[in-house]
């Protein structure tokens, strides 16, 4: 299938290849969201090891390609975990700042706009046996927009109000200022939003327990949030580090199109099977993307 016609008759396209090259095969300005979790710094995996000293250099081709392929209203979201650096047997390991460096470069070198740097707090982190710092229980999510101003679907990711918040609303009022310059001239009760509370920039939940042949399977709720927040039905979502296809499964469930790439053929085969099993939500036509 020609990628230039992607979306005409297919909900998804996956291929075993380097994701930066896969992105280059997509039409320019066609992608609404590039979401993915690249290899973590220094993590030894069957799909390779990206050393922290070379990390920015390794990820640069992906960001270069993403910027060209993203629509002007598109977003790039990267979930990545920092690592600890070893400094010899007589010194303590230190936390690497490579993720922070990457975030700064995404703004300064790639001229992307930081929507937020969110945090994924894991309720069941893997025990590391670390004795020189606290248990590592979070990962960072670098959320950037191609253009500013940007628009996100906050209503799609609102959350339920806590009992404490609802009690606060019951006793809270807008009070008029004595100078009369505020738009509230009379005392007025504050009402909670009927769609729910504003989403937090902290995502909490367990690490995926799915029995899939992959060393770092994403939980569904992570890509789900950013797909809902940044895309609409029929938009194209791309994961250049697809793994076994969790991002794609969530995209298809929500009626989006999906393209994914991975360098391990076994993962691509698993992803293709999982994606094919997702029930049809989006009605396709022959317009393409």
Pin down the residues of each PLM region.
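Short, flexible loop/turn segments with low-complexity composition
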Residues: 154-158, 282-289
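Core catalytic lobe of class I
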Residues: 1-270
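Short, conserved SAM-binding/catalytic segment
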Residues: 1-9, 272-287
């Amino acid at each position: 299938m020609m990628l230039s016609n992607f979306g005409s008759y297919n909900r998804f396209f996956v291929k075993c290849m380097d994701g930066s090259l896969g992105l280059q095969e997509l039409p320019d300005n066609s992608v609404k969201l590039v979401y993915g979790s690249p290899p973590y710094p220094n993590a030894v995996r069957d799909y390779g090891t990206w050393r922290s000293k070379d990390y920015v250099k390794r990820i640069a081709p992906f960001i270069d390609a993403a910027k060209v392929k993203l629509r002007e209203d598109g977003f790039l979201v990267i979930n990545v975990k920092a690592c600890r650096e070893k400094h010899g047997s007589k010194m303590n390991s230190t936390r690497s700042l490579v993720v922070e460096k990457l975030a700064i470069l995404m703004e300064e070198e790639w001229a992307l706009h930081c929507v937020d740097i969110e945090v994924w707090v894991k309720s069941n982190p893997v025990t590391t046996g670390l004795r020189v710092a606290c248990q590592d229980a979070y990962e960072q999510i670098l959320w950037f927009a191609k253009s500013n101003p940007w628009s996100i679907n906050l209503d799609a990711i609102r959350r339920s109000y806590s009992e404490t918040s609802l009690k606060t609303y019951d006793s809270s009022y807008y009070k008029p200022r004595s100078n009369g310059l505020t738009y509230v001239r009379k005392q007025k009760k504050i009402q909670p939003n009927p769609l729910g509370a504003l989403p937090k920039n902290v995502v909490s939940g367990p690490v995926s327990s799915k029995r899939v042949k992959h060393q770092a399977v994403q939980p569904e709720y992570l890509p789900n949030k950013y797909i809902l927040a940044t895309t609409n039905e029929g938009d194209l979502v791309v994961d250049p580090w697809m793994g076994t296809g969790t991002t794609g499964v969530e995209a298809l469930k929500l009626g989006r199109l999906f393209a994914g790439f991975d360098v391990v053929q076994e993962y691509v085969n698993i992803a293709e099977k999982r994606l094919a099993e997702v029930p049809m939500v989006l009605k396709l036509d022959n317009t393409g993307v």
